[in-house]
């Protein structure tokens, strides 16, 4: 018998990368592929040991793709086996979770009907994957997703086919059925859709009734519908759940502003819509290609199967052969018609979805173009505001530094003012002491002047007295020379002669005292004059120092007032104004007009 299964390769395509992402998850560029080979034998199990088993599909996950692992578990009830699914990457992306109840349980019909000796019911069997034999090898290259199927060796002898020891009542197909390897799942969230095609093979050589054939057709149609629904759900899963599909490869961004985050979300949604639309388009193309290929391969496979059945059906009567061939052809025609109707319905739904997505895409593009100028304007305003904020911060730092320097300067000036006030108080005390000493000296000087005046008066009196005595003496000498006196008693003349030297001595003594008094008066007057000059110089020095202290005190006071006003302006938040002067009482008095305390 000829080959029954068909090999239809899925075409993978990659979705677009998220353009807004600044950090991409870079993985290895080497694509890992999992090739699964099957020998193409259709085994029909009628025994209780090996023919009754349950095929449980397990979904395994590798780094770059999902695959379905088929394992055989023996059970005791009469139940058909389930086949492995080859519909591409289940889920499409790494972050998608599947519910076990979501995809229906698939029961693909093997298109070969076999009647057992005990019961006349039709039993569908599953494809049992085994290792490839030397005759049929499926080559898959990592550079391409296409697969080549090599021809198989000629049919096995009938003795091997009909051996009851291998499998009771089982038939083997000489053609090798091969299932395409599961497609790779790249790290850029790409997925493949491989349409599931259930081959239609000839019916069993042991015959069958129309009722059994009808039951097989109904069962096979339900399985085909389940497979198509699963394939379509795989193709449109990203459209139904765009948020889940992007969890695995979500983009990481730094914190942005509200407007920028909104624009970023809109761009991501637009990219998701574009990706979903492209995937739907490619899925539609793949399904269309698969349908065309199926329609083209069906007549060829039918002819091949008929040619293979001809040499083996010579032992059967011609009526049974024609009946079997007619049943197979009718079954194939019905199946092709059903598939055609299903594909047309899927095409119409996909076209409607494509129109809807194109409309949404155009609306998103219009929104993007409308938001672009507003976004640019907002970004420009944000840049300007950030520049102004940085400038204000710099000015604030400079103002704080200036305030700190002014405060330190004010503290130093206050300390200097305190020291100057202490010195001024000390000088005032010293000035008061000097003034009191000057007053006492003035009083002493007045006393000395009064004493000098008294001495002068006494000296004048003594001088007048001496002049009178000298005049009397000259008169007496003149009289004595002109008129000698008569001799009188000796005692009188002797007394008079003795009185003259005494008077002369008294006169000399008085003259010496007068000279001494004059010298003392001159010395005292010169001393007083010198002391007066010294005290006058000291007074001038004290007055000069007082004027300097008053001037420095006024300058310090004005400077403190200016600094206090500047600090008040800075505390109120006003800018530094123009330099100002302080109007104080007596602040504009010139240096020459400052009068010291009266001494």
Swiss-Prot record:
Gene Ontology CC: one annotated term: dendritic spine
- Report the principal subcellular site: cytoplasm
Q: Does the keyword Coiled coil apply?
A: yes
Q: Which residues form a coiled coil?
A: 256-572
Arranged from A to Z, the UniProt key words for this protein are:
Cell cycle, Cell membrane, Cell projection, Coiled coil, Cytoplasm, Lipoprotein, Membrane, Myristate, Synapse, Tumor suppressor
Q: How is it modified after translation?
A: Phosphorylated on serine residues. Hyperphosphorylated by the cAMP-dependent kinase PKA during cell-cycle progression.
* Location of this chain's protein in the cell: Cytoplasm; Cell membrane; Cell projection, Dendritic spine; Postsynaptic density
- Tell me the superkingdom of the source: Eukaryota
Keyword Cell cycle in record = yes
Region span, Disordered: 135-190, 288-324
**GO biological process: what's one of them?**
negative regulation of macroautophagy
Lipid attachment (N-myristoyl glycine) is at 2
Q: Where is the composition biased (Polar residues)?
A: 174-190
Question: Which residues lie in Basic and acidic residues bias regions?
Answer: 153-162, 288-313
The cross-references to InterPro entries, in alphabetical order and at most eight, read: LZTS
What this chain does, per the record? Involved in the regulation of cell growth. May stabilize the active CDC2-cyclin B1 complex and thereby contribute to the regulation of the cell cycle and the prevention of uncontrolled cell proliferation. May act as tumor suppressor.
Family according to the record = Belongs to the LZTS family.
What does the subunit comment say? Binds EEF1G, TLK2 and CDK1.
Name of this protein = Leucine zipper putative tumor suppressor 1
- Report the source organism: Mus musculus
- Tell me the classification of the organism that encodes this protein: Eukaryota, Metazoa, Chordata, Craniata, Vertebrata
Recorded name of the encoding gene: Lzts1
